């Protein structure tokens, strides 16, 4: 009998939950262990299971003085890549992954943030990526975004897989890890809550996201399904 497929979810911020990824992972027979970093320490790489999912947060990648888990989390992602553990890093996770390998993040980028349903264009090589390939086949995808900080320099030797009209580094791969600036997990309700937390109009955001949710949800589910597929492959090979 095959063993259970397990993944670890790192949650830096109570305001940034796993949201729709929770039921999507469950429907793909992946058991999860959640690690809320305001309550627990960054885990050891040997305890991650078959995969690692790093969520976003309202803090920045440079807030290590207030959030001492930031450096250990970066070290964990490096260790996960060294161990060839499938890793998906979202928003803040994407930014921490970039800096962990020598990239650069600009906090509160003067060009402004991206919020709401945002078109992302895929570079040619993205269609071959084992995690993002199905999503990239369309050439352009509508995805949920909520960020003001930006990866302005990728790690040495790493190429961008996707760009938006405003920022060039929407997704990248380094070894077994993929970072995405967008939020494949975010529902219209969560996007509205984030808008309210930042002083915006949550009702307007929810309405706008509901208009596009058929496409946005489909695209997010493609990412979740591909991630789960990688976890099952790793589990069977173990």
Regions found by a protein language model. Name each.
Residues 5, 50, 141:
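Nucleotide donor/acceptor-binding cores
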Residues 5-25, 38:
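N-terminal beta1-alpha1 ligand-phosphate binding loop
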Residues 10-13, 54-58, 148, 182:
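Glycine-rich His-Gly loop
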Residues 23-88:
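Flexible gly/pro-rich beta->alpha loop and the following alpha-helix that scaffold active-site loops
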Residues 25, 91, 227:
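Residue-level signal for inorganic ion chemistry
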Residues 80-104:
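Catalytic nucleophile loop
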Residues 101-188:
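Pocket-forming structural segment of enzyme catalytic cores
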Residues 186-238:
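Acyltransferase
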